[in-house]
């Protein structure tokens, strides 16, 4: 079983971290915009695993609840 198949066992809304592509599907924000947002040094909803960006889903939810625009 590969990593993608394992990730499909747990729904996105229950995972602690999600990929950029999953975050884009989850929020409706494009991958490019999410990448731009996570490039900021003050971004607290990104977690780096080597050179891979993982999105902290709960922190992203909090950010979006308080954001006026992205």
Model-derived regions: residue spans:
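Short intrinsically disordered terminal tails
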Residues: 1-4, 65-70
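Generic extreme N-terminus detector
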Residues: 4-5, 41
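Polyanion-binding surface elements
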Residues: 6-33
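Major-groove DNA-recognition helix of helix-turn-helix-type DNA-binding domains
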Residues: 25-54, 61-62, 67-68
């Amino acid at each position: 079983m590969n990593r993608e198949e394992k990730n499909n066992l747990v729904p996105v809304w229950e995972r602690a971290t999600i990929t950029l592509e999953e975050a884009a599907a989850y929020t409706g924000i494009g991958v490019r915009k999410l990448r731009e947002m996570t490039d900021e040094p003050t971004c607290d909803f990104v977690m780096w695993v080597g050179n891979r960006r993982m999105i902290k889903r709960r922190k992203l939810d909090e950010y979006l609840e308080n954001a006026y625009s992205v």
